[in-house]
């Protein structure tokens, strides 16, 4: 596991955007696992700049989002469908829509939708890169504490802490969906390479638990210790004291 403090959200996001761009440039049929939320805004902003500057052919790139709120239509401003369109797919409108995969949070039968999305993940094979954030309680995707390590795509009852943390995106806390559909932990670990981003003081405790705690369902992110190729990029505020700062120009 590689852990790097790049000083700021902007610097870390730029570095990871370059990693995604290189993957798409050198592997035109690559498969990317994508994440959403406030952590990822600078990442997509930087990636869009790189794509527009170089007019990269992404017609054969496939994307797979981690999760979606249950009960929100794709057109809802707080849905992750809307987020991805707003942050990436409308900003660089050359991705092939048939290769964009995001769980449907408004399906009539959500358990069937979870099974369907899991089938897509299995049929498409390993993602080349999986992008992750981390929740204040150590969740990855929407896999809350207590989620079995062998879980696959499933419907999640969101914890009070997650609902509270996400309420800043809604008019009030009561508007936050109480469930989500999420890739399971086993799905996440199937990726060839995992890149986790964490920014801000509120994420420091979760990162500290991830780095120092034994693998436990109480902190789902600790499962990443079982994966052979994990990179964690932090800013100063999220970084535990024992991780030294490094500048992007010092990296290979």
From Swiss-Prot:
Q: Which GO terms describe its cellular component?
A: cytoplasm
Q: Which InterPro entries match?
A: Glc/Gal-6P_isomerase, Glucosamine6P_isomerase, Glucosamine6P_isomerase_CS, NagB/RpiA_transferase-like
Keywords carried by this UniProt record: Carbohydrate metabolism, Hydrolase
One Gene Ontology term from the biological process aspect of the record = N-acetylglucosamine catabolic process
Query: What's its catalytic activity?
Result: alpha-D-glucosamine 6-phosphate + H2O = beta-D-fructose 6-phosphate + NH4(+)
Show the Pfam families listed in the entry: Glucosamine_iso
The Gene Ontology terms for molecular function here are: glucosamine-6-phosphate deaminase activity; identical protein binding
Which pathway?
Amino-sugar metabolism; N-acetylneuraminate degradation; D-fructose 6-phosphate from N-acetylneuraminate: step 5/5
**EC number(s) from the headed UniProt entry:** 3.5.99.6
Record flagged with keyword Metal-binding: no
Q: Where is the active site?
A: 67, 137, 139, 144
Q: Which Gene3D superfamilies match?
A: 3.40.50.1360
Q: What does this protein do?
A: Catalyzes the reversible isomerization-deamination of glucosamine 6-phosphate (GlcN6P) to form fructose 6-phosphate (Fru6P) and ammonium ion.
Against NCBIfam families, the record matches this protein to:
nagB
Instruction: Please state which protein family the record places this protein in.
Output: Belongs to the glucosamine/galactosamine-6-phosphate isomerase family. NagB subfamily.
Listed name of the protein: Glucosamine-6-phosphate deaminase
Q: Which gene encodes it?
A: nagB
